[in-house]
Amino acid sequence: MEFTIRALTEEDRHSKANVHYESWLSTYNHISVNDYLENLDKAQFIKKSSLHNLPTLVAIVKNEIVGFITYGKTESISESDDWSEIYALYLLEAYQRHMIGYALTQRALELTYPDNVTLWVVEENTNAIHFYEQIGFKATEHKKPTYFGKTYNEVRMDYTRTEHDH
């Protein structure tokens, strides 16, 4: 499958937000609170997603945005400033397992060099955990945040440069 990766433009914001909504639903359908998903307001979700102003790369297939990755300096690790974070990686379901997510992640890793990179994954999202492990991320921490009235198990995964860049 042919695709290109480029930086998000202002004109892309709505399409990116729509991908965020659609892929969020398909990803979390089996692990989120059904009441929350049933009451998820698409317009409100898209509006909120469109407002994010972090570095974002989009994947394009046939002039359509099919996925994105959002990353930047982390705010969750205060002991040093040599960490970046992947905040979101979403692909429409039909475009998963075509190396697009891998290419987005590799490009984000290049753009955050020389920082180490961290991210958080819901523990039940085993597909994502396996994907990140294949790239070289390792589970380093667990926490139990509460979203929408439900407590989740989250795994912090780190990509440490010294292990990968020799």
Predicted region positions:
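Short coil/turn segments at alpha/beta junctions that flank glycine-rich nucleotide-binding fingerprints
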Residues: 98, 114-115
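Active-site acidic-Proline motif in GNAT/NAT acetyltransferases
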Residues: 92-98, 123-124
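C-terminal "cap" of GNAT-fold acetyltransferases
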Residues: 82-84, 115-118, 122-129, 134-135, ...
